[in-house]
Amino acid sequence: SVGDLVSGMVGWQTHHIPSENDLKTLRKVPDVLPIPTMLNIFGSTGITAYFGLLDVGNPQPGETIVVSGAAGATGAMVCQIAKIKGCHVIGIAGGDEKCSWLKECGVDDVIDYKNSDVAEELTKLAKDGIDIYFDNVGGPILESVLFLININARIICCGSISNYTGEQMP
């Protein structure tokens, strides 16, 4: 109906005039939570983190999870869900500000890829290996993680930020 709040894959905008085909994919947003809460919980980054970690990663209490791009929208949600599930969380991000913020969010260990050797730090922090890797980056960070991955570990490939510039072939 006119004035309904709907969600769908239509891009970020305040208004949308749907085609007949669009109407099939739009969903009315239920009026059960405040709009900011709904956007946070059910936005694409939240859905990606939730189902990627819980359905593919299947985290168990005590497992070690490494999250690259940990200060990004999806990565930060993954870190927090993993903590709720009782995991030891190692977050990888770039810069003091992002790394400090991750510590405030409860991430157990943080690696600043801009100012440290990721492979060396991972070896120190993941003494019993890595059970889950939520990969938002790819490239050299993925390679560092693979050397420490445990048997029966789960790797969730979510993004490949390291290849976004197009300067190198993946």
Predicted regions: what they are:
Residues 2-69:
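NAD(P)H dinucleotide-binding glycine-rich loop of Rossmann-like/cofactor-binding domains
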Residues 140-170:
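Glycine-rich phosphate-binding loop and adjacent beta-alpha segment
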Residues 42-116:
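Mid-domain Rossmann-like dinucleotide-binding core that forms the NAD(H)/NADP(H) cofactor-binding site
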